[in-house]
């Protein structure tokens, strides 16, 4: 894909989807490195859209075989704001929000934080369902994961 033409850097697009919230959910990602694409996806029976957005990013980082420079694009403001604005404060506050409440999806945020620290990660945001080829493919994979789970 033309959108993946950055040399020596992994470019990834991630997405999560949910049928019902909570409900059956799926996540998908497409990773590209030097022109080679890899598609990954998975699903859960009882989850939320935000958990699936987080899982897509987590599974993307878990798919890397060594320390990498990676740009991860998401259409999730929850993921984008969480990683760029909220995470440092949550950690400093003992995984509590500014309102002193437990951080939702703390388990996944902690996993994502740990994985992010193993790589040189740049986060990007794209508007969902706006014709971005990488985002559309990640969305397709997330929905494929849901369809396969429903079909079982």
UniProtKB/Swiss-Prot annotation:
GO terms for molecular function, please?
Answer: magnesium ion binding; nucleic acid binding; RNA-DNA hybrid ribonuclease activity
Respond yes or no to whether keyword Nuclease is given for this record: yes
Localization of this protein: Cytoplasm
Looking up Pfam families in the UniProt record yields: RNase_H
* Broad class of where this protein is predominantly found: cytoplasm
Instruction: Name the SUPFAM superfamilies for this protein.
Output: Ribonuclease H-like
Note the SS bond partners: none
Q: Which GO terms describe its cellular component?
A: cytoplasm
Q: Which InterPro entries does the UniProt entry name for this protein? A: RNase_H, RNaseH-like_sf, RNaseH_domain, RNaseH_sf, RNaseHI
**Domain RNase H type-1, residue spans:** 6-147
Please give the PROSITE patterns that the UniProt record associates with this protein.
RNASE_H_1 (PS50879)
Keywords, in A-Z order: Cytoplasm, Endonuclease, Hydrolase, Magnesium, Metal-binding, Nuclease
* Cofactor(s) listed: Mg(2+)
Secretion signal span: none
Recite the UniProt cofactor note for this protein.
Binds 1 Mg(2+) ion per subunit. May bind a second metal ion at a regulatory site, or after substrate binding.
Catalytic activity of the protein:
Endonucleolytic cleavage to 5'-phosphomonoester
Q: Does the keyword Oxidoreductase apply?
A: no
Annotated residues that bind Mg(2+) 1 are located at: 15, 53, 75
Residues noted as binding Mg(2+) 2 in the record, renumbered to the chain: 15, 139
This chain's function reads: Endonuclease that specifically degrades the RNA of RNA-DNA hybrids.
The record ties this protein, via NCBIfam families, to:
PRK00203.1
What quaternary structure, including any partners, is listed in this protein's UniProt entry? Monomer.
Instruction: Please give the family membership noted in the entry.
Output: Belongs to the RNase H family.
Q: What is the name of the protein in this document?
A: Ribonuclease H
